[in-house]
Regions:
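Acidic, carboxylate-rich catalytic segments that either coordinate divalent cations
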Residues: 173-226
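Hydrophobic alpha-helical transmembrane segments and adjacent short intramembrane/lumenal linkers
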Residues: 124-183
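Membrane-proximal, non-transmembrane interface segments of integral membrane proteins
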Residues: 5-99
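Transmembrane alpha-helical segments and their cytosolic interface motifs
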Residues: 70-116, 131, 135-148
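Juxtamembrane helix-loop transition segments at the membrane interface in multi-pass membrane proteins
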Residues: 2-16, 116, 193, 197
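Alpha-helical transmembrane segments of polytopic integral membrane proteins
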Residues: 45, 112-116, 148, 152, ...
Length: 226
């Protein structure tokens, strides 16, 4: 069981990269059919299987790789929305937890646990039912991906551009720590969405507006507790 779950995660990552390459190279023909079949195989246990099947019906040897990716994106519309809602809820709670804590450094272990739980919740939305060893492996993979992400790609950079910096200055130390932890947790949520999806990221799965909404919630609630 554990081996099968690990293989599923690896297969999703591999197909995601292959689809991105096929789209970049403008592939069409039999290679697109093979990619569609590989996607259908990995989505066989997805709670959204029927939605994906309906969207993939028109993909054949005459289709371009981009059409396949767009069809998969349509299938991911609902789980993406659910995952973003989960991320928003959990990240706000985590940020407020740190902002209200008198011992934020000691609470970082609990934050790690909350983030790991969030990752598992996101995986479940996409139909990935993982045992503890595989969940831990997925969490480590996400942290590694974040370590290698370019600075221009991070949610922190896209959310700030002076705005988040001003927010941190205006808040107290504890609330500022809550915001920093929230931004980090937001990046973890985004990476969890990435590694749970077959389709490569066409547009930011977690955008600037969501980051602003989360940070605004922490600011308002922190101010209300003073």
């Amino acid at each position: 069981r554990v081996w099968r779950q690990r293989h599923q995660i690896d297969a999703i990552t591999s197909l995601n990269r292959r689809l991105a390459e096929a789209e970049r190279e403008g592939e069409m023909g039999q290679s697109v059919v093979e990619l569609r079949e590989a996607a259908e195989h990995l989505l066989v246990d997805s709670p959204y299987r029927q939605v994906f099947e309906e969207n993939l019906l028109g993909i054949d040897a005459g289709s371009h790789a981009t059409e396949l990716v767009v069809a998969l994106e349509r299938g991911y519309a609902e789980p993406d929305e659910r995952a973003r809602a989960l991320i928003q809820r959990e990240v706000v709670r985590t940020g407020l937890f740190i902002a209200a804590s008198p011992y934020p450094a000691l609470d970082l272990l609990l934050v790690a646990w909350r983030n790991a739980r969030m990752v598992n919740g996101i995986a479940q939305i996409y139909g990935l039912k993982l045992s503890f060893p595989v969940r831990w492996r997925l969490y480590r993979m996400i942290l590694q991906n974040m370590a290698f992400a370019s600075a221009t790609e991070t949610v922190l950079d896209s959310a700030s551009e002076g705005w988040a910096s001003n927010l941190l200055v205006n808040l107290g130390a504890r609330a500022g720590q809550g915001v920093a932890v929230a931004l980090y947790s937001l990046r973890i949520g985004r990476q969890a969405m990435r590694v749970s999806r077959i389709a490569p990221e066409q547009r930011p799965l977690v955008d600037r507006n969501l980051a602003r909404l989360i940070l605004g919630s922490i600011r308002e609630r922190s101010a209300g507790t003073k």
